[in-house]
């Protein structure tokens, strides 16, 4: 009962607004026709609206890359423009920042290399791995295309959340995942634990469930299973699967923490400590089935008490 009370208290105390800077690249490539161009425009607009209006991203830090049919409202989704944007960000990003990248459109796999189809020359999964290598920020990479699965392994790494719309390189048909991912970003019900914030995992889980329901309602075989990896082991898992993933994705939120921490090193250190404790708590949850009940509860309660103490300090200093 005591542990329940501690957790309930923490849910209130950690529902504060991030000291980090948050950046987003929303990238559309070649449209493949007017139907897809209109669909991608809807997704881009939905993501931008969610990031800026719902989660408080600065409009200047959300860069939109459009397909070849669009003449205004964004930069062309070319390899050159994408490379330039990432090069610019690499000079600004710090280890505390968040970079959120979403790929919208089409992908291909020829048996050797998976590609995201851009306007002009494409970028392979290996190209993306090279582009993002060495970035200090926490990275969220969401590839919503059919040929997204082969992107998971080369992009996996520490402080990275990689999401793919499919679990097989053989998937060739257009995915419904991006539609439900965008909807999940915009819906209050996505906050599954009701702590007032929306984590990457919550968006992923909500979108994954909606995809399954999409196929079930139509009496169709489920042909796409979204995966995520957030522990750098290069192994993707579905949202409802057990395993070591989840600690980072459950504690990396789309909305911001405390802006005041930017000018307060002590507060920033406390927020960093809270992140670490939250990640430890998620890791402890994964160990519950493999530990004796009393031992697990004792260790988890100790962790929750420390998290409560740090959260109280953050609240007092903010």
Say what each PLM segment does.
Residues 2-14:
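Bacterial N-terminal signal peptides
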Residues 16-100, 114-115, 247-256, 315-318:
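Boundary/activation segment at the start of structured domains
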Residues 30-38, 67-76, 113-119, 165-171, ...:
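Second-shell loop/turn segments in exported
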Residues 27-31, 65-69, 102-106, 119-121, ...:
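Active-site-proximal beta-strand/loop segments in catalytic clefts of secreted hydrolases
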Residues 144, 263-264, 270-271, 278-316:
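Alpha-helical, heptad-rich or low-complexity scaffold/stalk segments
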Residues 77, 103-135:
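A short, glycine/acidic-enriched catalytic loop
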Residues 191-278:
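Caspase-like cysteine protease fold
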Residues 45, 140-230:
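Active-site-proximal C-terminal subdomain of hydrolase catalytic domains
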